[in-house]
């Protein structure tokens, strides 16, 4: 059985809410100067690796601590045996300096230099730029060994990945949308969903009342379903004062028959002075004698029963 690999962060036993956000001066004085002098740290937060052997996206897994930025102590090699230029080749690409070096001072004394670098994939000078950034901290007077290939025994590096402009814009849009929703979006959205739910339930009630089974060939298509409206009070009282639009059923090449159930109400309909009484809803077909000028209207009486009156058009009022 192999040894179980321990989580470096779990071994640190850090208190809840601990954060590591040192300033440039603290990194230089409290960490790099002490590391170069051979001092040990009671709490190891910065890993020791040869940073230039890895691609930057591999480095977070080798850090001891950090979520969005990671810190490392690393040696820095010479590009040429007797030269003073550092070797910037790393992994599948290279680090390229950008911007102006910043001098770090403490108590009026200069102690180090901060340099910013960007990682490029490929070979210089035609590499592809990435969003990986390094801040390299080095001492002004490093300890150098004659004949050594190392330019510095230790430099301190901060690694992080910069957000693109598109990522920043997406984040800003998300935050703006969240604020708008919290201010007025929730009430508007809630009302809209309630209105949709009411209409959907009314369509289901209408199908059940007319005896349509789910998936039945006699079920009215959506475009031929009665349209419930209330021009007075919005959607309050929809169930009490329905208005059905049956105009689309007239003149169709194929009009579905309306199936009857034993509980369907009685409806009176007629033409002019002639009225007829029938039990249930009339059946319509292509040879129907009912024209667009004929019609009937229903008014609820005695609970479930209906009595009709002549209407100017064809449809429920």
UniProtKB/Swiss-Prot annotation:
**Gene3D superfamilies from the xrefs?**
NAC domain
| InterPro entries in the record | NAC-dom (IPR003441), NAC_dom_sf (IPR036093)
At the top level, the lineage of the source is: Eukaryota
Biological processes annotated in GO: jasmonic acid mediated signaling pathway; response to water deprivation
Residues annotated as domain NAC: 14-162
Q: Which residues bind DNA?
A: 111-168
Query: What Pfam families would the database entry show?
Result: NAM
Q: What induces it?
A: Strongly induced by high salinity. Slightly up-regulated by drought, abscisic acid (ABA) and jasmonic acid. Not induced by cold treatment.
Reported function: Transcription factors that bind specifically to the 5'-CATGTG-3' motif.
Copy the domain comment. The NAC domain includes a DNA-binding domain and a dimerization domain.
Q: What is this protein called?
A: NAC domain-containing protein 55
């Amino acid at each position: 059985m192999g040894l179980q690999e321990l989580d470096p962060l779990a071994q640190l036993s850090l208190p809840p809410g601990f954060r590591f956000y040192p300033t440039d001066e603290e990194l230089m004085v409290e960490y790099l100067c002490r590391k170069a002098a051979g001092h040990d740290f009671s709490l190891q937060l910065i890993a020791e690796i040869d940073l230039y052997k890895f691609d930057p996206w591999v480095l977070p897994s080798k850090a001891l601590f950090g979520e969005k930025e990671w810190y490392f102590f690393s040696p820095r090699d010479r590009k040429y045996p007797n030269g003073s230029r550092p070797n910037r080749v790393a992994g599948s690409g290279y680090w390229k300096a950008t911007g102006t070096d910043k001098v770090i001072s403490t108590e009026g004394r200069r102690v180090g230099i901060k340099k910013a670098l960007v990682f490029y994939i490929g070979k210089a000078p035609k590499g592809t730029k990435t969003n990986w950034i390094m801040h390299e901290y080095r001492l002004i007077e490093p300890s150098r060994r004659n004949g050594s290939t190392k330019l510095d025994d230790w430099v301190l590096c901060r690694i992080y990945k910069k957000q693109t402009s598109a990522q920043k814009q997406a984040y800003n849009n998300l935050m703006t949308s969240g604020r708008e929703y919290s201010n007025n979006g929730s009430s508007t959205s809630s009302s809209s969903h309630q209105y949709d739910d009411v209409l959907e339930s009314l369509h289901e009630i209408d199908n059940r009342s007319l005896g349509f089974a789910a998936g039945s060939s006699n079920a009215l298509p959506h475009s031929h379903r009665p349209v419930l409206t209330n021009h007075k009070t919005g959607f309050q009282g929809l169930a009490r004062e329905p208005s059905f639009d049956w105009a689309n059923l007239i003149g169709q090449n194929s009009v579905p028959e309306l199936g009857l159930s034993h509980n369907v109400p009685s409806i009176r309909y007629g033409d002019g002075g002639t009225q007829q009484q029938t039990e249930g809803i009339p059946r319509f077909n292509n040879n129907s004698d009912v024209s667009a000028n004929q019609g009937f209207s229903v008014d609820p009486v005695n609970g479930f029963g209906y009595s009709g009156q002549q209407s100017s058009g064809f449809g429920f009022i």
